[in-house]
Amino acid sequence: MNWRSEWLWIEPITGSRRTSNFCRACILFFGSLGFFLVGISSYLGKNLIPVLSSQQILFVPQGIVMCFYGIAGLFISSYLWCTILWNVGSGYDKFDEEEGIVCLFRWGFPGRNRRTFLRFLMKDIQAIKMEVQEGLYPRRVLYMEIKGQRDIPLARTGENLTLREMEQKAAELARFLRISIEVF
């Protein structure tokens, strides 16, 4: 949900705290935990998970492989949970016509470059570009073309906007900034 007035447009950006990421992280965590516990159960010769019988699984080679897959899955799951906890990719786009400044802010991974803050003058913005690739894996991205700089993406690839929503968003932004739209 964006906030807009006559002189100011603020658009919050959803980062990694999405329902799909929560579901992926949960499924991956419980699946890999199950693999790990079955592998350990085959080593100990006891059922650590009452529902699953691990007596038919030999520790060499199946138990070792299941432990390995379980550990790998737990590492990937912890990475996903950290990105959700730190809300990587979230931030806002702020277009301030009164001051003539565009500010783009994003949160990243902890460290020296945790905060990404870009500022541009509105008069340096040349156009809003739309990249549209249809097919099996469609790609629709909005870019802001800035004089003397590379194009800056505004809409992420994972946002899954329909073509109509993308055109509407590009048209509203171009109208607010009083610039043209380019499609490639």
From Swiss-Prot:
It is found in: Plastid, Chloroplast thylakoid membrane. Coiled coil: none annotated. It comes from the Eukaryota. It is a multi-pass membrane protein. GO terms for cellular component: chloroplast thylakoid membrane; photosystem I. Keywords: Chloroplast, Membrane, Photosynthesis, Plastid, Thylakoid, Transmembrane, Transmembrane helix. Belongs to the Ycf4 family. This is Photosystem I assembly protein Ycf4. It comes from Cycas taitungensis (Prince sago). The gene is ycf4.
